[in-house]
């Protein structure tokens, strides 16, 4: 389960942070790409699959 504040690192060093999660009022996960300063909105299943291959930083 993803939680607000979780950070993940991709193989190329790009870090992503979850800043909106299901335990908030959101129906989507909001994931920030910290390298490019963009926000990605994903459905829960897609967000979990997207981050599953990455290393958890915190």
PLM regions: where:
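Intrinsically disordered, low-complexity, charged/polar segments
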Residues: 36-58
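Tryptophan-anchored aromatic micro-motifs
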Residues: 8-10
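Basic/aromatic-rich interaction segments and small domains that mediate binding to polyanionic partners
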Residues: 13-44
């Amino acid at each position: 389960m993803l939680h607000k504040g979780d950070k993940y690192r991709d193989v190329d060093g790009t870090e992503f942070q979850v800043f909106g999660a299901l335990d908030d009022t959101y129906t989507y996960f909001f994931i920030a790409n910290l390298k490019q300063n963009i926000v990605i909105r994903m459905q829960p299943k897609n967000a979990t699959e997207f981050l599953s291959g990455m290393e958890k930083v915190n």
